[in-house]
Amino acid sequence: MNNYDSEHKSNIDFKIMAFFFKIRDFFKDPMKKIEKVDLQKGDYILEYGCGPGSYTIPIAEKIGPTGKVFAADIHPLASEKVKKRADKNDLSNIDTITTDCKVDLEKSSIDKVVLIDVLHGLENYESHLKEFYRVLKKDGRLWVDDHHFDEQQIKSRILSTDLFRYVGKVDSLYEFQKVSL
């Protein structure tokens, strides 16, 4: 497959995924999940693997105009889709990042990292967890939800790096806290 074909397939795959997420979101309001994450007005959030922004918009609404969401995804169409949704919802507290790991944010600048249905797809999850650790503030939180993994798989991946400690679970969301090294 040449470069054009693989990029075209990737774009089609993203559009199909976005379509199915739109249907999912109609039946399962993303805000209901986000309400369970301990988000505060003014928080700085990294949503890694944001896709078309299903959870980005509710996060931005919950943290308000004094907060900031950094919506990161590997696919360039994710950035376009999130920007359009932010404009449609009159939200100016969302920045997008296209990346496969490094997010180019300052060290200790993020209150919480949110990973929803992403952990299973991270080929080198240790590198990602190190990057999340780097950008999280002291005692920052990592929230993970991934229906592809059971509880043991989620915990073992996150805890294997010794960068986070397990805090607890709220419904399908697992909370971890950055540890001091």
Per-segment meaning from a language model:
Residues 60, 126-141:
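A short glycine-rich, Lys/Arg-flanked "PGG" loop and its adjoining helix->strand segment in the class I
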Residues 75:
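Conserved SAM/SAH-binding beta-strand->alpha-helix loop
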Residues 162-181:
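Core SAM-dependent methyltransferase catalytic element
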Residues 24-43:
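Conserved alpha-helix/loop element of class I SAM-dependent methyltransferases that forms part
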Residues 111-125:
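A short SAM/SAH-binding and catalytic strip from SAM-dependent methyltransferases
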Residues 90-101:
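Conserved SAM-binding strand-loop segment of SAM-dependent methyltransferases
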Residues 102-113:
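A short acidic, Gly/Pro-enriched loop at the edge of an enzyme's catalytic core
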